[in-house]
């Protein structure tokens, strides 16, 4: 998957960076961090599979609400408990991402970020892997209302069950339930975790300049766009990987750059990125476009060109 990637930035200066997303192996300097991050990422596909298979407890909850009584309410509670345990697994995974993501930012952004992306390709691949996971998760979560419905029912029923013999079965109590509720209430919870984690990281770690992080994200977005636009790959899954990494980079850039990703002089080639995403016309494209529309924070700023707003907001 390694290709020579070229893009022209806002200053019309051509950059050429080799990134081998398919075959990149960690160097000795990368190995320890790569192993740490990989121990988290390797579980990502199973998390996505469980989320896609999440059917929810709608029928049990409906019966308990429309025909309340010990039998229907106990049945709903017993159905919801294992589902909520699964939701906790999703939430706990977000905490692991919250821990490992700043470590990647330090490695890739402490020094020249473009050189770091080129010279630490295994870590650059992991950055793209995180964006790929986050956009997959959020896209699947957004179209599954059973997740929030199940957890809302759990919280409503929690206090009553704490007063009964069912108390012994309760693993997720008030404080954790409150944190999980905030997590699942957000339309794109995993991306929210990344953006909040990055903002917090930049406010606390003075060794990594903010400009280095935004440069790394703009570079990642532009080269991923270039890979798709120049038809480097025929496999749909590789193109979608690049598009998710591109969109994730743009969203995070928009959250931490003072002017955001959409201004005329943005280092992100935002118009070509949007055009390529719309032209991709895949099953996942609408979800990625919605992520750009609703998860970014600067799209509706007065400095955003009208043509960009129209391009993104109109189908």
Curated annotation (Swiss-Prot):
Q: Which residues form the signal peptide?
A: none
Q: Which UniProt keywords apply?
A: Lipoprotein, Membrane
What is the topology of this protein in the membrane according to its UniProt annotation? Lipid-anchor
The protein's name is CYFIP-related Rac1 interactor homolog
Biological process (GO) annotations held by this record are: regulation of actin filament polymerization
**Role summary:** May negatively regulate RAC1 signaling and RAC1-driven cytoskeletal remodeling.
Family per similarity comment: Belongs to the CYRI family.
